Amino acid sequence: MLRRFPTRTTAPGQGGARRSRVRALAWLLASGAMTHLSPALADVPYVLVKTNMVVTSVAMKPYEVTPTRMLVCGIAAKLGAAASSPDAHVPFCFGKDLKRPGSSPMEVMLRAVFMQQRPLRMFLGPKQLTFEGKPALELIRMVECSGKQDCP
């Protein structure tokens, strides 16, 4: 089950988002979900829990060939892998046709980036992502509960 953290509605300069991020990351470490977290990852918008992969960058850009399509690209990094290892960094991209209904981009990303397409638990920091009008936390919950009978 995902643990939600309250987010403050303070101005960017007041440090509310940073306090929330630090509190959330401290919970991750204390819970044993992650044994090592690089200081560089403190500003990453989300961290995967119970896997050895973290998404280190994500960007959205228009697909030049078709203007009604967006591309979401990023890099997932394997914790503990040598930087020279071929599987240390996994680049990924997926597209979404803005005119057609279908799987959410977040669900596509979660299933495309990580091998074996197993359900994932994920922590989202104060930078809330929204895809197709749905908060990312709800999309993550949908992916996590995929195929389980104990999910609402």
From Swiss-Prot:
Compartments in which it is found: Secreted; Host cell membrane
InterPro entries linked to this entry: Enterotoxin, Pertussis_toxin_subS4
SUPFAM superfamilies in the record: Bacterial enterotoxins (SSF50203)
Complexes and interactors: Pertussis toxin contains five different chains, S1-S5. They are organized into 2 functional subunits: A, composed of S1 (which is toxic) and B, containing S2, S3, S5, and two copies of S4 (B binds to the membrane receptors). Dimers of S2-S4 and S3-S4 are held together by S5.
Keyword tags: Disulfide bond, Host cell membrane, Host membrane, Membrane, Secreted, Signal, Toxin, Virulence, Whooping cough
Gene, per the UniProt record: ptxD
Residues spanning the signal sequence: 1-42
Lineage: superkingdom: Bacteria
Native source organism of the sequence: Bordetella pertussis (strain Tohama I / ATCC BAA-589 / NCTC 13251)
Keyword Disulfide bond: yes
Any one Pfam family match given in the protein's UniProt record, by short name: Pertus-S4-tox
Protein name: Pertussis toxin subunit 4
Positions of disulphide bridges: C73-C93, C145-C151
The protein's role, per its UniProt record: PTX oligomer B binds to receptors on the eukaryotic cell surface and facilitates the translocation of the toxic subunit across the cell membrane.
GO MF assignments: toxin activity
A cellular-component GO term for this protein: membrane
